[in-house]
């Protein structure tokens, strides 16, 4: 059974789990319904069309040092093959994961000590959109070897006015890997702004 995490909690991912290397990190969200009744939903109305994008920053000693260490819809796979984005979901509609990132911890180079998972809203300024228009946001980790959900973190804070979310981190702790539920909303409007926090 998956462990449910709260903001600020940390958990061992690999300790006591010999051979665990391949993970699937799923991120999901839903647009807040604007109502509109049955016919609105039937005709495709309801919530606003919000294009959230999940990305991973691969950090070296806590710093972002190479633009190729940004894995997102424009660069789907890391050079090492340890981080792979499966592609962009443009609407966030439907149940389950909206975007998925495949991780192979054994392939992540030794100089990379942290993977930061962020979500931002594409073109948020022009579209006047923020995370107050999103509900049911979560990040979860699945063991790819048996498809078992290991943990899930539901982002329950009020993120109204926030345009980016630093959802979680997977980081080295000695010879093991840990997961941290971060859940920090920011006013960064572009991926470059988020990256600048780690330069």
Swiss-Prot record:
Keywords: Cytoplasm, Stress response. CDD domains: TerD_like. Induction: In response to low temperature and salt stress. One of its GO terms (cellular component) is cytoplasm. Gene3D superfamilies: sav2460 like domains. It is found in: Cytoplasm. Its main location: cytoplasm. It comes from the Bacteria. Belongs to the CAPAB/TerDEXZ family. This is Stress response protein SCP2. The lineage of its organism: Bacteria, Bacillati, Bacillota, Bacilli, Bacillales. The gene is yceC.
């Amino acid at each position: 059974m998956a462990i449910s995490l709260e903001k600020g909690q940390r958990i061992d991912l690999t300790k006591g789990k010999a051979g665990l290397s391949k993970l699937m990190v799923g991120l999901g969200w839903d647009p807040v319904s604007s109502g509109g009744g049955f016919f609105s939903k039937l005709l495709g109305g309801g919530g606003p069309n919000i294009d959230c994008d999940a990305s991973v920053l691969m950090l070296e000693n806590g710093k972002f040092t190479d633009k190729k260490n940004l894995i997102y819809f424009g660069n789907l796979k890391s050079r090492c093959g340890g981080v792979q984005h499966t592609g962009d979901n443009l609407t966030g509609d439907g149940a389950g994961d909206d975007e998925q990132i495949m991780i192979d911890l054994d392939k992540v180079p030794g100089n990379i000590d942290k993977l930061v998972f962020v979500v931002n809203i594409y073109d948020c300024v022009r579209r006047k959109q923020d995370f107050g228009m999103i509900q049911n946001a979560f990040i979860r980790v699945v063991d790819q070897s048996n498809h078992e959900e290991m943990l899930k973190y539901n982002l329950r804070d009020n993120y109204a006015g926030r345009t980016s979310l630093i959802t979680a981190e997977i980081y080295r702790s000695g010879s093991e890997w840990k997961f941290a539920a971060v859940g920090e909303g920011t006013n960064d409007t572009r991926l470059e702004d988020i990256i600048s926090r780690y330069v």
